[in-house]
Amino acid sequence: INSLCNYYNVRYVMAFNTGFDYCKTKCRDLLKDREFIDIFLMACQIYAKRKSYIDFCRKNNYLSKSKKSIATSAESFYAFLTNNTEYAEEHTALEDSKIEMAIFLACLKAHKPFTKNQHYFDYCNREGGNRWEFSIPAIAK
């Protein structure tokens, strides 16, 4: 994989929740000479606190498993960005990569700052960080 990345001059490695992928992969050296973008962190930084996203999630029941906060899944972000409340994630490698790319491109088009080279979990647990930063209550206060 590394030689293919070198051949095609890959500068960035991206995934939705890179922390999970990083822990599960045997190809950790991919990040040695490349930057990485956690699309999960990127989408949270750009969309999770927007009133339009929060309202969309509350109205359409996109909630966390505990039902205490709004969802921040690839499925909920994609449904919001495409305004498709019928969307159901297929959970195949190809389809997941397609929606992750769509989320990434939408984030880029927003022209907002985002963090590179940090996994969502590490960002939320950094010094001075707030692990609940993107935990928006499911019910409006």
Say what each PLM segment does.
Residues 1:
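Flexible, surface-exposed loop/gating regions in the mature catalytic domains
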Residues 5-140:
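Metal-dependent phosphoesterase core characteristic of DEDDh/y 3'-5' exonuclease domains
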